[in-house]
């Protein structure tokens, strides 16, 4: 029987050992991910500030509170887009996405708004086939880290880790995606928690709906 990790209930002690019940373990970030221009600590701080400001982790409510208009469109392939038009910010979402994927795309686009608004303004916005591949674009990894930090609270994540849950169990319990769970582990590792770094797909937002 695998030994379960013990996470203090207060979660203030960062000497946490993650049990090897996770499905796949890696020691490095996926090859090809370019160095971030926004540090993980800055992303975590920005995401936490927005959650505190809006009082919610719901991406639609966050978008509304931040003055971003969310519009649904029958895209053929792309999942979403972020644009700044005449200083007005827009998020476009494919109108037939699975609810979990819809939330992930919304959170991802909110990450671009929070972290990359200036770049988006310069290039006329971001589209799915340009932005959802972390292997080719450093901003994608940053936006996905932001999405993981917004959607998954430290407390919920660590409580499930204490129970010995693996990535799939955590994702299922928190109505999330295993890749966001792995990215959440990255953010906690950066804060000093001794978790085993988890493998995640560099283009996970490309899967169907």
What annotation goes with each model-predicted range?
Residues 1-209:
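Active-site hotspot residues in diverse enzymes, especially metal/ion-binding acidic/histidine motifs
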């Amino acid at each position: 029987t695998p030994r379960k990790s013990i996470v203090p209930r207060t979660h203030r002690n960062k000497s946490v050992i993650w049990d090897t019940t996770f499905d796949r373990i890696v020691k490095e970030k996926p090859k090809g991910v370019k160095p971030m221009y926004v540090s993980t600590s800055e992303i975590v701080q920005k995401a936490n500030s927005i959650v505190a400001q809006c009082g919610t982790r719901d991406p639609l409510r966050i978008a509304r509170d931040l003055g971003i208009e969310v519009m649904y469109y029958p895209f053929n392939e792309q999942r979403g887009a972020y644009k700044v038009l005449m200083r007005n910010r827009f998020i476009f979402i494919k109108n037939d996405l699975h609810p979990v994927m819809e939330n992930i795309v919304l959170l991802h686009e909110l990450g671009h708004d929070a972290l990359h608004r200036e770049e988006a303004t310069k290039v006329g916005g971001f589209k799915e086939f340009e932005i959802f591949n972390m292997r080719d674009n450093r901003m994608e990894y940053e936006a996905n880290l932001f999405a993981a930090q917004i959607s998954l609270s430290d407390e919920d994540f660590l409580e499930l880790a204490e129970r010995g849950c693996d990535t799939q169990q955590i994702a299922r319990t928190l109505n999330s995606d295993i890749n966001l769970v792995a990215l959440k582990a990255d953010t906690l590792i950066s804060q000093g928690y001794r978790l085993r770094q988890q493998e995640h797909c560099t283009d996970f937002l490309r899967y169907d709906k």
